[in-house]
Amino acid sequence: MKFYTSIPESLKPYYKAELNKYRTEYANGNLKSAWNHLERAHIIGQKYPYAHTFVHWKMLEFGIKIKNGKEIIGQIPRLIFGGVKSFVGKIPVGNPGGANVPPLKPFPIEKELQNIFEKAGIELI
């Protein structure tokens, strides 16, 4: 069994870029676009415990800020278990991380994100 710890340096710029885009879009009131960037950051970072947990924390904050009870409640178990599942390599690849989708269901990864993983030299699980 392979244990995952921190996000590789080759992938980190893409992860950080999505978080920065999230912050910018949120600050500009573009909530749908902001959420989309959180989902992309989740897909990029979900294999790595800290990155994965951090995105769920941001999703919880987002849910609180927009007063979405379903998102708030849905993020709590994801915060508790997401990082642990990442650590042992048991993640639903492509899952966008929001409470609007089943937490253990894998999803297809859009081509643009596949290209990011390829450029970074990261194999999808």
Where do the protein language model's features map onto the residues?
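N-terminal alpha-helical interaction modules that lie
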Residues: M1-W35, I43-I44, I66-I125
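TPR repeat positional signature
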Residues: E18, H37, H52, H56-M59
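Conserved interaction-surface patches within small, structured recognition/assembly domains
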Residues: L38-G45, L60-E61
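Alpha-solenoid repeat scaffolds
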Residues: Y48-A51, S86
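Internal catalytic or translocation cores that form aromatic/hydrophobic pockets or channels
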Residues: H52, M59-I66, I73
